[in-house]
């Protein structure tokens, strides 16, 4: 489980940053007549698995957020304790550590199509300040998803009415309560429960330039 994490970001005052897909993985190789098969996770939280460069669990969550949405935040408050989200779908149990955060300001476009690149987080001066570097990805097995920014209550209602009924089991209801609790803590300025993180995009050749300058 520590190798899988996601980031549920809220844009003030009450909108969630999500992904929207139109078809299922199982439809990828199906005949054309079957391409309208329902995707059981039509609306999903940006998430993924740890890679060798992720030193901390929340770094996996942040990196996957940037890779899957094609956006990054200039700064955000992220709740220190993640929620263990799990569900069982078609006999398979999924489990992710989901961090909940609040974006300060706007999301910034990385100017690249989601999942066509990998992200490397380079630590900055402070512990949760990162520079992000993009590297083209040679292969992409992800299905196409688009960015969906929707009101929190609309997302909760959609999940309750359309998506959760397709699962054998899930603790999404508890997760929704967790999100509400985190948002209430933020609104009440209980910022000691959050850590402050910043991201800054750099050119791919910036580290080489910096290294060259240091040698002069």
UniProtKB/Swiss-Prot annotation:
A motif (Nudix box) lies at residues 48-70. Coiled coil: none annotated. It is an enzyme of class 3 (hydrolase). Its EC number is 3.6.1.13. Its main location: host cell. Keywords: Host cytoplasm, Host nucleus, Hydrolase, Metal-binding. GO terms for molecular function: ADP-ribose diphosphatase activity; metal ion binding. It catalyses: ADP-D-ribose + H2O = D-ribose 5-phosphate + AMP + 2 H(+). Residues 1-177 form the Nudix hydrolase domain. Pfam families: NUDIX. The keyword Metal-binding applies. It is found in: Host cytoplasm; Host nucleus. SUPFAM superfamilies: Nudix (SSF55811). GO terms for cellular component: host cell cytoplasm; host cell nucleus. Plays an important role in virus replication most probably through its hydrolyzing ADP-ribose activity in host cells. May function in viral DNA replication or transcription directly, or by removing toxic substances or metabolic intermediates. This is Protein ADP-ribose pyrophosphatase ORF38.
């Amino acid at each position: 489980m520590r190798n899988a994490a996601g980031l549920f970001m809220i844009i003030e005052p009450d909108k969630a940053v999500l992904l929207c897909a139109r078809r299922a993985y199982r439809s990828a190789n199906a005949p054309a007549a079957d391409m309208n098969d329902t995707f059981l996770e039509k609306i999903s939280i940006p998430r993924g698995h740890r890679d060798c460069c992720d030193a901390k669990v929340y770094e996996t969550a942040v990196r996957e957020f940037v890779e899957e949405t094609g956006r990054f935040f200039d700064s955000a408050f992220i709740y220190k304790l993640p929620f263990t989200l799990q569900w069982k779908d078609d006999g398979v149990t999924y489990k992710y550590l989901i961090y909940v955060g609040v974006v300060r300001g706007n999301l910034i476009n990385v100017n690249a199509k989601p999942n066509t690149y990998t992200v490397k987080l380079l630590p900055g001066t402070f512990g949760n300040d990162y520079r992000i570097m993009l590297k083209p990805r040679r292969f992409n097995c992800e299905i196409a998803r688009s960015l969906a920014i929707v009101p929190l209550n609309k997302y909760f209602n959609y999940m309750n009415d359309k998506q959760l009924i397709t699962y054998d089991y899930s603790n999404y209801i508890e997760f929704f309560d967790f999100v509400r609790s985190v948002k209430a803590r933020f609104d009440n300025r209980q910022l000691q429960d959050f850590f402050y993180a910043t991201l800054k995009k750099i050119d791919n050749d910036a580290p080489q330039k910096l290294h060259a300058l240091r040698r002069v």
